[in-house]
Swiss-Prot record:
EC number: 3.5.1.103
An annotated GO BP: mycothiol biosynthetic process
Naturally occurring in which organism (per UniProt): Kribbella flavida (strain DSM 17836 / JCM 10339 / NBRC 14399)
Cofactor binding mode and count: Binds 1 zinc ion per subunit.
Protein name (Swiss-Prot/TrEMBL): 1D-myo-inositol 2-acetamido-2-deoxy-alpha-D-glucopyranoside deacetylase
Signal peptide (UniProt feature, chain positions): none
Catalytic activity entry: 1D-myo-inositol 2-acetamido-2-deoxy-alpha-D-glucopyranoside + H2O = 1D-myo-inositol 2-amino-2-deoxy-alpha-D-glucopyranoside + acetate
Cofactor: Zn(2+)
Amino acid sequence: MSELPDRRLLLVHAHPDDETINNGATMARYVAEGAHVTLVTCTLGEEGEVLVPELAHLAADQSDQLGRHRIGELAAAMDELGVTDHRFLGGPGRYRDTGMIYDEQGNAAVPPDTRPDSFWQADLVTAANDLVTVIREVRPQVLVTYDEFGNYGHPDHVQAHRVATYAAALAAARSYREDLGPAWDIPKIYWTAISETAMRSSLRRLRESGDHTTFEGMDPDGPLGPMITPDRFIDCVIPADGYLDRKMNAMKAHATQITVDGPFFALSNNDGNEIFGDEFYRLVKGTAAPGSDGLEHDLFAGL
């Protein structure tokens, strides 16, 4: 690989569209600022719902071609964000989307008929080694991935967290697998987050506008569940500023998964940009370098 810019950001996500929903503005910002942004997507998203009726035949229970279609959607989204370095973990189709069910309590859970080639069933060391190779090649100063709950409990998000965390540790070990490249210790690691204050504010605006279906059942004054992060744990906020349009265009590129009348665009159209404009992060490795407001506004702060 040719010599890379001084600032290098690596993001590890489970399926196509996760990167845009969680970090689209962040990715667009750092590309625009000249940083090298690398996205690793762990599956093709083969088990996703198809929200476009004329493409319903692509679904896993029909022609099972959704994953291949989503490769194109992801490429289009990356074009919108300006990201040129995108890889699938182990190569396209190496790990299959596990799918997800909801248990009796309404929590995300692993399907009972999980396929042996699913990401959930992947050998952790094998999958981590695939990522170690990328880490040692790109040498990122910052890694972004999910928390231990995978943000909302999807098995592939949980597995992506495990793989990214293990790979970061292995990549730093000088004596581990020299054939995968020279050791590299990532200085800062962040988990994506949704701010409690931002979520409550956006929900309140939706309800006041008469929208009671977007995120149905979520009360702006009630409990929000583990996918929402208390503000005291938020370390970095990346404002959307001039990048929200790029993020929204990238979301539209994931056409089989995100509809313009769905919850993400509802939040945006009803001035709910606190969630999907500003992007929130928890620092789990490295030293924070907050500003006067007690927060970082640059993932590379202090480096």
